[in-house]
Amino acid sequence: MSPERRIEGLALKVGPLGEHDRLLTLLSDDVGLIRLAVPGARKPRSSLAAAVPLTTMELQVGGRSGLLRVRQLRVQHNFGNVGQRLETLAAAQALSELSISLVAGDDPVPGMLSAVLMHLERLELLAQKQRSSEMKSAEGERVDRTLATLVQACVHLLALGGYGLPLQTCCRSGAALSPPIGNWEWRCSLLADEGLAIGSQAGAAIQINPSELALLQRLTRLELPERQDGGLMGPRPVWLRLFTLLESWCRVHLPRPVRSFAMVREAVANA
């Protein structure tokens, strides 16, 4: 029997395994992406029933061979509050799917877990803000920030996972991507197989203007770009365009589709 060990991480996905067990997909700094059997977790009053998605936990695991089994678990934090709003739930699920696409088993990605947790914490805060019937603008700002948080999270996670969209150099000419703010005729094209190219290119998945490119380039920073009054920089249509751009990039380059992107788009449209 292999020695038991402790693993800490974030549950990205949990599904049924047989009649009473669950299959847990965990993101960890130590082992990357690992799949674990959680015996009896579907039984009433099971001590392992807390193995649910979007939960950070400490596990004691072991097993003879093949799929390791969870012996004990201790919940550290549950991000279930993101489910209070459809848009934050969809964004959190998209983060989980994206992480699964970017991290291989037994191949940890430094910084991936902390980045995912940072953006989940932001989504959780957005979900917990009370609704105000008197201020529709505040509700709209919350939806916009949810979308912007996901867009920025995609930029961060793709870069960490080795699939980052090059944001500083034209993929065709090698020239610097320096958006000429105020020149509304200038365009930058996403060639999904290659990257961003200066000008209106044939076959482009989407074209963006100078201010949209400048906003996209700022997303590599830690915080979301804000105006001087503290409001989010950029209106919702711009964030939707940047979301479409990154969605197109992911569709071509990632090994599996992020299906929750469609749910995010629907949730934002219906908000």
Swiss-Prot record:
Pfam families: RecO_C, RecO_N. InterPro entries: ARFGAP/RecO (IPR037278), DNA_rep/recomb_RecO_N (IPR022572), NA-bd_OB-fold (IPR012340), RecO (IPR003717). Keywords: DNA damage, DNA recombination, DNA repair. GO terms for biological process: DNA recombination; double-strand break repair. The keyword Cell membrane does not apply. GO terms for cellular component: bacterial nucleoid. Belongs to the RecO family. Involved in DNA repair and RecF pathway recombination. This is DNA repair protein RecO. It comes from Synechococcus sp. (strain CC9311).
